[in-house]
């Protein structure tokens, strides 16, 4: 009410500003927009200290970038957009959303043109969705089709005298096999092969539909621009400066110095001006606020009192406090969780699930799986009203696992002995020295199966399925692509994030919504942690040591899928 009264008081001034916008737009409007698709997107914002220290500009948020593309599609008279495509460092979830946005521009009759100096499969997929495609005559592309080559340390562990005991809830929960074996078990291997096959099928469909490029061409490890031009994939070969400087000319070639451009340039300032002009209303009325909250990284076992955000990690206290604030803020009408987590601590997964359920009781909460919601990530999603994703999202891994390292033989090789004093039943579980008693083994198996049963109950409640159906086809640690999971009823749709926001707007029965991205702050602690020298073992998939030196308790039950995170990239 107060806002409406203020808008009435200042209405004459606001109308005057709107008049100037109309005049300025008449001068600034153009029919061509030049835009760089960045190589990375941010999930957090940098603190002032980090910005000063690093000095680099932050990468944009994916959501902001997509909303910008949507705004471009509404500009009257816009005929063409030239995209400078950097080689993507993000996952197929981001790429698919960008491809959908480019498709939407094409459908609106806006000609999209792309230029890429080089890159891999993702760069080619983005380029493929543009109507005109360009590269330098010197450009080379290095495509890699869906495949996997994981490390196995079973032989090394045996030589060192390290025993690895895995207690898994199903044959497909292959988390411990990396350390126990020299290859995957047949069930786990078959599941991964099926997922990779589905990924290839999606890529094949994407390339054929957008540009007609046969996926078999991408089996060649090096593709020159000359070859892609002969195949008809590239429209022409241009140097980068030609594309950057001559984008107002139809063919990106300026015949003469005084040649008249074919297009009129629309600058970012002009786009912002048009958006303000378009969104002007005589009366300022409140619109529903929709929060998009990124949930990014492994779910940590930390239950300390510290509430600070941790970059690329899901910490309990930070999200507990965030969910509480969202729950209690009357201005917020709905929440979308942007999920990118392979899981982690079973205990923290359950605690955060309960916090999400509390939030869901107050307002609509939806999960959007960008790249991965496996194990604990999917567990969290089950606390929301709906679960959506992309066809490329890696989902599932419904089950539990626990690892225990037995170091006695290694210690003895090094001349180290440990003596057990005052041990009681099951105390050996907390020791890495010696094998477990039969009773302790049975205890751990029961704990893992109990955690699995709780997980199953969360899924069956959220997705209205039976435990029998879940275990027979979709549980026991299996991983799937989003499209497969959607057909089985475990995702509500495979949609772009913009389509999900449109659905939220319709569900709220609102003409407009105010979409706000709510990232955490990457502060000096995160920066120093990232700068620490040491073993960065992400590439080796070592489960108890991540890039930030935060360890899982080896006696803790995990809802975690290490392979899912890799496959999503």
Regions inferred by a protein language model and the residue ranges of each:
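C-terminal alpha-helix plus adjacent terminal tail
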Residues: 2-16, 26-28, 201-208, 215-218, ...
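A short, well-ordered alpha-helical element
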Residues: 55-78, 309-332
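Conserved catalytic cores of soluble enzyme domains
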Residues: 84-225, 341-482, 506-507
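C-terminal long alpha-helix characteristic of the crotonase
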Residues: 160, 199, 203-211, 225, ...
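Intrinsic disorder and flexible/low-complexity segments
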Residues: 284-331, 519-569
């Amino acid at each position: 009410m107060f806002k409406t009264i203020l808008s009435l008081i200042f209405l004459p001034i606001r109308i005057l500003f709107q008049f100037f916008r109309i005049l300025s737009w008449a001068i600034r409007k153009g029919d061509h927009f030049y835009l760089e698709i960045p190589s990375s997107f941010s999930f957090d914002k940098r603190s002032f200290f980090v910005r000063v220290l690093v000095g680099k500009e932050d990468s944009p948020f994916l959501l902001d970038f997509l909303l910008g593309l949507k705004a471009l599609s509404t500009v009257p008279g816009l005929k063409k957009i030239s995209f400078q495509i950097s080689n993507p460092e993000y996952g197929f979830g981001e790429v698919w959303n960008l491809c959908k946005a480019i498709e939407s521009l094409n459908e609106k009759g806006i000609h999209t043109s792309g230029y890429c100096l080089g890159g891999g499969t993702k760069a080619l997929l983005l380029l493929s969705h543009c109507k005109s495609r360009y590269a330098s005559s010197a450009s080379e592309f290095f495509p890699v089709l869906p495949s996997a080559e994981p490390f196995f340390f079973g032989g090394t562990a045996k030589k060192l005298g390290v025993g690895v005991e895995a207690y898994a809830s199903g044959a497909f929960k292959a988390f411990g096999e990396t350390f126990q074996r020299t290859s995957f078990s047949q069930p786990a291997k078959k599941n991964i092969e099926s997922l990779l096959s589905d990924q290839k099928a999606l890529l094949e469909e994407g390339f054929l539909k957008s540009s007609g490029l046969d996926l078999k061409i991408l089996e060649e490890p090096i593709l020159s621009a000359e070859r892609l031009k002969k195949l008809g994939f590239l429209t022409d070969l241009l140097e980068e400066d030609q594309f950057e400087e001559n984008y107002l000319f139809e063919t990106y070639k300026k015949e003469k110095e005084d040649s008249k451009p074919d297009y009129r340039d629309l600058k970012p300032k002009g786009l912002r001006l048009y958006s303000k002009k378009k969104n002007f209303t005589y009366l300022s009325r409140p619109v529903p606020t929709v929060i998009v909250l990124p949930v990014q990284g492994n779910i940590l076992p930390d239950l300390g009192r510290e509430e600070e955000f941790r970059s690329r990690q899901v910490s309990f206290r930070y999200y507990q406090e965030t969910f509480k604030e969202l729950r209690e803020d009357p201005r917020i009408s709905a929440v979308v969780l942007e999920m990118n987590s392979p899981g982690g601590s079973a205990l923290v997964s359950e605690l955060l699930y309960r916090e999400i359920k509390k939030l869901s009781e107050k307002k609509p909460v939806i999960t959007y799986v960008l790249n991965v919601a496996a194990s604990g990530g999917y567990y969290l999603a089950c606390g929301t009203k709906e679960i959506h994703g992309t066809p490329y999202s890696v989902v599932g891994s419904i089950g539990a696992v626990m690892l225990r390292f037995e170091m006695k033989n290694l210690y003895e090789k090094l001349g180290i002995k440990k003596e057990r004093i005052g041990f009681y039943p099951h105390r050996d579980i907390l020791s890495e020295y010696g094998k477990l008693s039969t009773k302790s083994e049975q205890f751990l198996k029961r704990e893992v199966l109990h955690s699995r049963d709780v997980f199953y109950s969360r899924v069956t409640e959220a997705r209205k399925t039976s435990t029998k159906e879940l275990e027979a086809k979709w549980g026991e640690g299996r991983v799937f692509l989003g499209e497969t999971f959607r057909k089985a009823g475990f995702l509500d749709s495979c949609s772009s994030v913009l389509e999900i926001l449109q659905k939220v707007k319709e569900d709220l029965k609102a003409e407009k919504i105010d979409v706000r991205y709510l990232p955490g702050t990457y502060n000096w602690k995160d920066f120093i942690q990232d700068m620490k020298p040491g073993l960065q073992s992400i590439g080796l998939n070592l489960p108890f040591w991540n890039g930030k030196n935060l360890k899982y308790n080896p006696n803790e039950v995990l809802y975690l899928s290490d392979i899912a995170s890799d496959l999503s990239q």
